[in-house]
Amino acid sequence: MADAPYKLILLRHGESEWNEKNLFTGWVDVNLTPKGEKEATRGGELLKDAGLLPDVVHTSVQKRAIRTAQLALEAADRHWIPVHRHWRLNERHYGALQGKDKAQTLAEFGEEQFMLWRRSYDTPPPALDRDAEYSQFSDPRYAMLPPELRPQTECLKDVVGRMLPYWFDAIVPDLLTGRTVLVAAHGNSLRALVKHLDGISDADIAGLNIPTGIPLSYELNAEFKPLNPGGTYLDPDAAAAAIEAVKNQGKKK
């Protein structure tokens, strides 16, 4: 077992096609845009420039995160390291909101309900029918999951609940070996992890936004608590600007 500090890097996938269109995405599997591919590559360049080179990657089973990991590793010349994919790192399932325009949803339901669905810790959107257009209930990549583990909607509390077992069972053991671990995932699965790492309250987590394509570096002590609370963005100026853009999602038409 290696001694602390342990090195952890979080990377939200680059801009996706539905990010660009301002649609709720969730478990719908969409590609990166050309801009998103550039963001992912830039993320890898930032890792290389900082000398923060991952030894292993954990990502979701959604191609926007998988592709982000691939592009970042290519840019950092670390394309040869192990990559582990798991559904527990998937984006939050947005239920019946999946595929809906955020600005139209805001206009239809009002800001209070919109923000409750989007940012509250424990209020999920309406459930998505199993046979709906944007349902993943019959997706073959989830065939091994019992029905009760295939969500039809989720709040962030649900994401924390399904993500933490993977953190303890898969990511922590890699950190304990002294490996630098890259988690390439999604806005809400990463918010769930940051909530756990930084001990953010259920109320305060609503204000946390994570930008696309900018690595967030943590050093963790022996109890896996941050030595740098909140983490350190490898491009702080770009991160600050991108966080403002994330805050304004839903207002864009």
UniProtKB/Swiss-Prot annotation:
Keyword line: Gluconeogenesis, Glycolysis, Isomerase
InterPro entries: His_Pase_superF_clade-1, His_PPase_superfam, PG/BPGM_mutase_AS, Phosphogly_mut1
Superkingdom field: Bacteria
A Gene Ontology molecular function term of the record: phosphoglycerate mutase activity
One GO biological process term: gluconeogenesis
Cited Gene3D superfamilies: Phosphoglycerate mutase-like
UniProt site (Transition state stabilizer): 186
This protein's pathway: Carbohydrate degradation; glycolysis; pyruvate from D-glyceraldehyde 3-phosphate: step 3/5
Keyword hit for Isomerase: yes
EC number: 5.4.2.11
Catalytic reactions on record: (2R)-2-phosphoglycerate = (2R)-3-phosphoglycerate
SUPFAM superfamilies in the cross-refs: Phosphoglycerate mutase-like
Residues given in the record as substrate binding sites: 12-19, 25-26, 64, 91-94, 102, 118-119, 187-188
Pfam families recorded: His_Phos_1 (PF00300)
Active site: 13 (tele-phosphohistidine intermediate), 91 (proton donor/acceptor)
Protein family per UniProt: Belongs to the phosphoglycerate mutase family. BPG-dependent PGAM subfamily.
Oligomeric form and interacting partners: Homotetramer.
Biological role: Catalyzes the interconversion of 2-phosphoglycerate and 3-phosphoglycerate.
HAMAP family per the UniProt record, alphabetical: PGAM_GpmA (MF_01039)
NCBIfam families: pgm_1, PRK14115.1, PRK14120.1
Protein name as annotated: 2,3-bisphosphoglycerate-dependent phosphoglycerate mutase
Organism from which the protein derives: Streptomyces coelicolor (strain ATCC BAA-471 / A3(2) / M145)
